[in-house]
Structures are given as C-alpha cells and as structure tokens.
C-alpha cells in the first residue's frame, strides 16, 4: 500500500510539466550558470538542485524556500539544451504549495529577496509575480516594506551618519543607476545621483505600465534609497547643465554612467513618416506621464519583445477593439518572456508569427494600412536565432491604426 507521501509524489509527477525530461537534465548546470538570482543570492539558490529535488522528492520541494526565488527571467530556458521552462515548472509547484498551506517557505524567501535584491518592491511587482501562485501581491508588498523598514532602522542604529569612503556620482535614475546608488551607499560611500528628467525612475517610471508597476511602489523605492543617504538631483543633464569636470570639482572620486537606451530604432520602410505611427516607448511614456493619447479601434504592434507586449496590453486597456502583434519569426525565437506573451494572448491580443511589415499605406498623410509579407525561417544568424526570410508573392494588407515597436532600443547620442 502506498503511503500518503508516495501518493502525493505520484500525483505531482503525473501532472508536472515536462516530467519525463527532468530525468535527463541534471548534468550540464547551464540553468544555474545563467541565473541572475544565483548571482545575487549565491548558495541560497540553485535551480538545478531545486529541479532535482522536484523529481526525487516533490513533497520536500513544496516546503523549500528556493521554490519561491525564481524571478521569471527565462534566461535558463533560452540556454537549456532541452528548452525546459523552469519558471513554469516552479510555478506549478508553487500553486500546489499554496493549496497545501505551505506558506512559511515563501515568508523565508521574502526575507532573502528584501535583504539581498536591490529595489525589492519593484522586483516583486515586475519579476517574481507571487500572485500567479495564488498569493495576495498587495499584502506581500506591505510585508516586504515592513521587513525593509526594520532593516533600515537596524542599519541606522549601527552605522555612522556620514559616509566614510568618499563621494561617487551616478548619472541616471533608472534601474541601473538606482541599484548602483543603493549598493554604494550600503558600502559607506556618499552618492549623488543626477537625473535629466523632472522625476527620478528612468525607464521604471517612463515605460513600465501602471498595471505592472504603480507609481506608489516606485516612490517608496526611491524614498528608501534617499533614506540611506543618497542625494538625487533631478532636472540636471550632465554634459549640458554641468560637465564631468564639475563632478570632479565637487569632490566625486568616480562616476557611474547609467543613462540607458531611451531612443527607439526606426523601421526602415516606406511610409514611416505618416501620422498615426508611434514608437512603443514614446507611446508608453505618453501614457505614464498622463498625456491624452488617442488610438483607433484596430491597432497593430510590430515586434516581439516585452515592450511590444506592454504596448499591446496597454492599448487594450485604452479601449481598442482589436490588437494584433506582428512578429517576423516564430514563437520559439520571440525575445519576449514567454509568460508575458501568454498573458497578452489571454487578455485578447492576437499574435501573427512569421509576418513582417513591408510598407505603410496612408490616406491624407495618415496611416491607414500596412502591406505585410509572410516569412520563413532559414539558418541561424549571429544572434543564434534563425533568420527570417521573405516568401516571394505572399504579400497581404492589414487595415490599422499603428503602434511601431522596433526590436531594439538605441543608445542616446
């Protein structure tokens, strides 16, 4: 007769995604080597070991802190020889853990996230997604803030008020700049951050939709960094309002430049100057900054990255009846995180694979349609993805109001 534990393990194995493949994935370690959380937490997290635990002893895996430390970046999936989707395997186990009431492992994981990962409220909102396992995200964010405030009070009690290791300037208040400022201040440096825009946050404020990251959460993250002693000076463009010589004169011993890539690359096809075409980064920035944006009922988004998914979902929330994403390769080559694409489709976004725009068509200087062409996949290019090759004679036309989302962003010159 099977024990209750054996019965539970059998049930988990029968339901577990890619269970058979798991038996053969314990040798290369690519998942661990490519994991960003491993870089931050070290020995506290190892996805390969967690995967082995799920196969050998799933009941023990349900009570493991590690189960809750995957941040959904899919770097492991993109590099895995068997293309295992570890985030989705771990999500399956998280849901079972939630159903069985195994909440303490998550509480332990939350402590590690808050104490070791910069901008924990942002990463919990945008990366870890506890709500996907049936947990209350808002309640978790409150707990995370309480943990961090307690940590800050302890730090203030133990450390001197003034930094002891000199001054460093940081240019840009996006994720990179804020992370560097956070890390340097914790190590005893005096940090001044310069931001060209009126408010700090960079791409966090500019382009992540409000349904993914609220302004309230971002404000709390920035205030926490200020409470560490970091000075943030907005409305100052280094190179225009002051130069590097000024930074040295002010006593900064080093400068970190984290200005990001805020410019979209333009599609080099005919008709790109027509009204009604807007780049996705500009579109999201207009929405986040409170500007009125008028869209049509039929919207097309070009590109297969995460920005394209955000633009498409935001457009639906603004009232579009139909939103279609055009991507020139297949789903397997899509740069967007697979779960983001799935959520977009679940919300009603249609994704057309192996389709590329050929030219924009217009009436009265306003875009009215796209002439598209179907593609086929060839040999891999320098990125490792298979090349998209046009199929001669496969052109067709889509009527639209258009949002253009180039596949890459360009550095600011």
Predicted stretch roles:
Residues 6-27, 51-73, 153-171, 176, ...:
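Ferredoxin-like iron-sulfur electron-transfer modules
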Residues 401-402, 406-413:
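Single conserved hydrophobic/aromatic residue that forms the stacking wall/gate
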